[in-house]
Amino acid sequence: MTELFIDGAWVAGSGPVFASRNPGTDAVAWQGDSASAADVDRAVASARRAFAGWSALDFEARCEIVKRFAALLTERKEAIATAIGRETGKPLWEARTEVASMAAKVGISIQAYQERTGEKRQDMADGVAVLRHRPHGVVAVFGPYNFPGHLPNGHIVPALIAGNTVVFKPSELAPGVARATVEVWQAAGLPPGVLNLVQGEKDTGIALANHRQIDGLFFTGSSDTGTLLHKQFGGRPEIVLALEMGGNNPLVIGEVEDVDAAVHHTIQSAFLSAGQRCTCARRIFVPQGAFGDRFLARFADVTSKITADVFDADPQPFMGAVISARAAAKLVDAQSRLVEQGAKPIIAMTQRDPRLGFVNAAIADVTGVANLPDEEHFGPLAQVVRYTTLDDAIERANDTAFGLSAGLLADDPKVWEHFRRTIRAGIVNWNRPTNGASSAAPFGGTGRSGNHRPSAYYAADYCAYPMASVESTQLTLPASLSPGLHF
């Protein structure tokens, strides 16, 4: 089984066999040998050898290869979307949007490099000041399972454009998507060694993260893993560490005129991708009183009608399975712990089959829970908090170590002005779902949500370092010498 891509060739791994499974059917989706520490070492060495030639290649030549990658993604959209759906459980309609986002990322990344990290010149009295940007070298990219194509792509594309070479370690839950994506890069004409793929589980990831020949590590995933990486690289300023992690995101509901619109945006915020987006709303702040009661009743009514089904079902469902049966069981357990602490289920979550990843969208009123845990439950479990004043809602919304996304649904622009000035998050939306984001804008947060803005416009910033030069085409003795110098 040749499932590793090293030095431009598909090769067999020498580590243990592992498999990914379709969470909606439990069928094996992919199987192969993992990369051992020796395989990882070969991949890093390959990337190191390729770095000099790739970084010396003309910027436009690098961009042409990346543009071919985007064109081929569009050609292979259905096949890649099917791979995404099979391994993640997300419906095909949503998987197709992920592939489209992967292709769109290329143009945005090229524009970002030119505007944020390109070359700038300024004349001086005795020469010219030049600002250039240089690639770091060999970077490790760790991808998540929820967007196994789009999110690693948000690191890989800007890294390659800047002239870095890459060793890619995808999630062990979505290796087939990684294989399909790297095949597109290969078809686009990427030179050997520029992008290497190491498949595997925890041991493969540890071997790559601990490798002394990487110059940077770009990670999208859980806050727990990201925090461990942050600790690991403490005291190593030579490593560029870019982290995009999770959030315990708040959505504050105001007394709006259009209740159905508010319910729609709340459902999109909480349950899109079966709640498996880092920007999904985890805490829904609803006003006390008659309006809040009416909103909650409608929210529960529409939520109760949401069905989850296999990724290729016809008609297509709003939600698919979560990533695994284990993840589904953890969500049900999280709900049970909240109930033990005083939460009141409005719609209780159940796991349809212990072998599968299907859970229903759930709502729990946690207003009465003292010391509500500051945790990200990565799935369709919405926690409702009733509030009395907007300032009360904002204070409680900010009571988190995370700071990824936040949203406000309100008709009054003055309420929005107050909210955006006082809420703490990297993505703050008004009358839009919390998981709505522009690829042309920074994507990321504060606190435990990360330290950079990966997977969007600002990714160019951590893919290259600035090099400042003062230059003159002629070497001449200055007309005026410093005191104490005699020629």
Swiss-Prot record:
It catalyses: N-succinyl-L-glutamate 5-semialdehyde + NAD(+) + H2O = N-succinyl-L-glutamate + NADH + 2 H(+). Pathway: Amino-acid degradation; L-arginine degradation via AST pathway; L-glutamate and succinate from L-arginine: step 4/5. The keyword Protein biosynthesis does not apply. NAD(+) binds at G221, S222, S223, D224, T225, G226. One of its GO terms (biological process) is arginine catabolic process to succinate. The keyword NAD applies. This is N-succinylglutamate 5-semialdehyde dehydrogenase.
